[in-house]
Structure formats: structure tokens, C-alpha cells
């Protein structure tokens, strides 16, 4: 065995600095801190407070509706998204080949992961399954207001229930998630549609069955692109005649179902679907949520797996992108090898919602809060201060103290910075009498107390 002589020089290598970094990285390390990647966020306490405020509201609402929380891995096989999510998301994947030569991706959405999780275990579970999650998701897309390369998302799903009651329940959860944060019907609207109804409408006006999916994908761009551009895409990409393109646009741009062409409304397939859709809206009215809901056939959702009722939530002023989107996806579990189960759900991101709360003055002011700050007059009282602090912490109180010897004035200033409600002052006299002084930091009132008074 080799050994080092005590008088021989020892050379310690820094495993980071000594790596053969390219010159531009060496310059970065030498001259400045590493920059944050574009489109990603840091969460110091002041910023984390808003994220926590949003997520806690989401959790409260989900639990009031009887949903259970779950999670999954942030890294999944890329096939889960290539086969199930549609081209738009596939083009935004953070994907790579891992050391096991597997094609993998950071999750861009949660629903395929949910389908995979349930595909392995749903057969033995009682239905309906009510689950929710708060994953961090990643998409390589252009950064703009309300859109980053990562975000936290509230996913809520009902699995195993095919009826419209589940669709109405899911949308009610989404609406209540925003109301819980102080938003009202003057702040946001839920625009709803039904892919089954839209598909029948397209067939009635003459869209070939094999062109329906492409038509929905193009129609999803309405609102983001001019109508003229969408019309050109229908003609150029799908080979529609000018007349058919106009009829398709008339369907999607109808102000209400009653404004559709009379000949279209007379078709029995259309009337059957409209009756079903009216039942869905009636349930929301019965829940007192009708003022939040508008029918909008342009809402088709871009993801390929949606099969029925779909919806998106928008701010009323139209200044932000969609706050939330969701709908029915009855075949997704089957597509990942699981039991064929009906399902409906939504995802709501924290980035655009944070923007909306800020615009409406609903972001809570960040305040540091601490129950007690323990102050000692001299080092002699330190052991007693530690005993008191630990006893209070064990009783569930938040307690801090200076970690170095400081003057009484500096300790009091530190208590103020920490947001302490009460300062506990221990001096030689108090130590001798087995008590201490409690000073209310708001009123300035002082009283002599013993530990049991605070427990």
C-alpha cells in the first residue's frame, strides 16, 4: 500500500477548476457567477412565496372535491410523447439519449405519465379515480409573457367515468381554483366546446373524415393567427376549396350554437350532440357557475388525444394566453397499453396565473414571520436560551436567535428583520428567577413569563 510521507508536499486538485473547460467557460467562472438559463426561474423566498400561495390554494380546492395527490418521474421515455401528444409538443421536448442508450425526455405535460401510471394498476382500483398533481414541466419554446421553458402545473383528472357529470365536475374544480385565489367572473371566463360536436359539424359541411384531425389542428390557431391566414392554411395544407374553407370558418366562428346555419342544425346527428352539450352546460348552471362559462367552438385544444368536451380559461381582458386548458381523453390509457377507461382532466400553469394575479393586485405581500426571537444579555444566558428555543420548537412554534455573540441592540434589530412577533429577553436577573421578559414587537408591551406560559 502506498503512503504519503508527512514531510512531502500534498497537492489538492479542485475537481471543477482543473477540468479542461473551454476558454469561454473559464472566463465565466473567473469573472462572474454563472447566469441562469433563459426561460428558467430561481425561487428565493420572496418569489417562492407566490408559488406556495398558488399551490396551497390549488391543493385546498382539489381536496375539497375529494381528489388525492400523486406524482411521477420528471424523466420519461420519449415514445410516451411522440405517440400520444401531437406534433406541437414533440417539437418542444427537452430530449436526449441517456447512458443506457434510451431516448428520454423531461416531461412536457403530465397526462401521458398519468396514463402510464394507471395503465399498470387501474384494473384493481375502484372507479372513478380522482387524482391531482403539481408537477414541474419543461418545454423548449420561445419565452414571452406568461410562457417560460418551465412551469409548475396543477393537473386534475377523473378516470373511469364517461358521463357528463365528470366533465362538469372537472371544469368546476378549475373555476374554483381561480376563485380560491380571489379572481371573479369579471376576471376570467371558461370557454367550452365539444370535439364530438365539432367533428359532426365538420362532416355535415363536407370535411372528409381523414381531414378532420388536420382541420382541428389548424382551427386551434384561431385567435392566435388572423382568420385570413387560417383560411389560407385550410386551402393550401388540406386542399379545401374556397367555399369549404369558408363553411369551416363559419362553424368555428359562430357566436353561439343557435347562430349556426339552419340546414346544419336540422341534421339529426348535430341536434343529438347539441342536446348532450346543453346538458353539460346545465350542470354548471346548477352549480352556480354559469356566469363563468361561454360556448366557443374555436376551442378544440391542440393535443391529439382529446375526444369530447374541451375547455380553456382566459382572462376577460384578453391580455394573456390561456390560464388553463383541459377536456376529455377517453382513449389515452388504452394507447399506452392500459385498460380502456374514459377520462377527463385539465392542466393549469403557475406562470400565466401569476401574471394575472399581479395584474389584478392579488399577489400577497411577502412578510417574514417568526413566533419568537430569543435575546440574551450575555453569554452566560446562552444555555438557557437554547433550552427555551428548543422546547418552543418542539411545541410547534417557530423560533430563532443570533448565532453569534451580539449586543442587545443588534439582537433586537435582528428580531425585527426576522419578523418576530415576540422577543424573549433573558438576562442575569431573569435567569436567577427562572423566568424571562416577553416583548410584543407590535405594541411594545413587556411582561415577565415562564416557559409554560408559552406552551
PLM regions: where:
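Auxiliary tRNA-acceptor-end handling modules of aminoacyl-tRNA synthetases
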Residues: 29-48
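Positively charged, Gly/Ser-enriched RNA/tRNA-binding surfaces
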Residues: 47-65, 76-77, 100-101, 111-123, ...
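Polyanion/phosphate-binding surface patch
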Residues: 70-104, 147
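Acidic, His- and aromatic-enriched active-site or binding-groove loops in soluble protein domains
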Residues: 91-100, 206-228, 315
Amino acid at each position: 500500500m502506498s503512503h504519503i510521507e508527512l514531510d512531502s508536499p500534498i497537492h489538492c486538485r479542485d475537481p471543477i477548476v482543473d477540468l479542461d473547460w473551454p476558454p469561454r467557460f473559464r472566463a465565466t467562472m473567473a469573472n462572474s457567477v454563472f447566469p441562469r438559463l433563459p426561460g428558467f426561474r430561481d425561487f428565493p423566498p420572496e418569489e417562492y412565496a407566490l408559488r406556495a400561495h398558488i399551490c396551497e390554494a390549488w391543493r385546498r380546492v382539489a381536496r375539497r372535491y375529494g381528489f388525492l395527490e400523486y406524482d411521477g418521474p420528471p424523466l420519461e421515455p420519449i415514445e410516451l410523447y411522440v405517440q400520444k401528444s401531437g406534433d406541437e409538443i414533440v417539437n418542444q421536448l427537452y430530449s436526449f439519449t441517456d447512458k443506457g442508450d434510451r431516448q428520454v425526455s423531461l416531461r412536457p405535460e403530465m397526462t401521458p405519465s398519468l396514463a402510464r401510471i394507471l395503465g399498470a394498476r387501474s384494473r384493481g382500483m375502484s372507479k372513478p379515480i380522482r387524482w391531482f398533481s403539481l408537477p414541474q414541466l419543461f418545454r423548449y419554446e420561445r419565452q414571452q409573457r406568461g410562457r417560460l421553458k418551465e412551469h409548475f402545473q396543477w393537473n386534475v383528472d377523473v378516470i373511469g367515468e364517461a358521463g357528463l357529470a365528470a366533465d362538469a365536475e372537472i371544469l368546476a374544480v378549475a373555476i374554483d381554483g381561480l376563485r380560491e385565489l380571489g379572481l371573479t367572473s369579471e376576471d376570467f371566463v371558461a370557454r367550452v366546446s365539444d370535439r364530438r360536436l365539432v367533428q359532426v359539424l365538420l362532416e355535415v359541411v363536407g370535411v372528409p373524415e381523414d381531414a378532420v384531425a388536420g382541420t382541428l389542428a389548424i382551427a386551434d390557431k384561431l385567435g392566435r393567427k388572423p382568420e385570413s391566414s387560417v383560411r389560407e392554411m385550410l386551402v393550401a395544407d388540406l386542399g379545401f376549396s374556397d367555399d369549404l374553407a369558408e363553411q369551416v370558418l363559419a362553424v368555428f366562428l359562430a357566436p353561439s350554437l343557435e347562430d349556426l346555419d339552419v340546414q346544419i342544425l336540422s341534421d339529426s346527428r348535430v341536434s343529438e350532440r347539441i342536446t348532450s352539450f346543453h346538458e353539460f352546460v346545465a350542470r354548471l348552471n346548477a352549480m352556480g357557475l354559469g356566469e363563468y362559462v361561454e360556448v366557443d367552438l374555436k376551442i378544440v385544444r391542440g393535443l391529439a388525444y382529446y375526444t369530447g368536451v374541451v375547455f380553456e380559461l382566459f382572462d376577460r381582458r384578453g391580455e394573456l394566453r390561456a390560464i388553463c386548458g383541459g377536456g376529455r381523453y377517453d382513449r389515452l390509457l388504452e394507447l399506452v397499453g392500459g385498460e380502456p377507461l374514459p377520462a377527463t382532466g385539465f392542466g393549469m400553469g403557475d406562470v400565466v396565473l401569476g401574471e394575472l394575479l399581479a395584474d389584478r393586485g392579488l399577489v400577497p405581500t411577502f412578510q417574514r414571520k417568526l413566533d419568537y426571537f430569543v435575546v440574551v444579555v450575555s453569554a452566560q444566558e446562552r444555555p438557557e436560551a437554547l433550552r427555551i428555543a428548543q422546547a418552543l420548537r418542539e411545541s410547534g412554534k417557530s423560533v430563532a436567535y443570533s448565532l453569534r455573540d451580539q449586543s442587545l441592540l443588534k439582537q433586537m434589530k435582528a428580531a425585527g428583520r426576522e419578523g418576530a412577533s415576540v422577543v424573549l429577553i433573558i438576562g442575569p436577573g431573569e435567569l436567577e428567577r427562572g423566568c424571562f421578559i416577553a416583548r410584543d414587537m407590535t405594541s411594545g408591551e413587556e411582561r415577565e413569563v415562564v416557559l409554560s406560559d408559552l406552551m
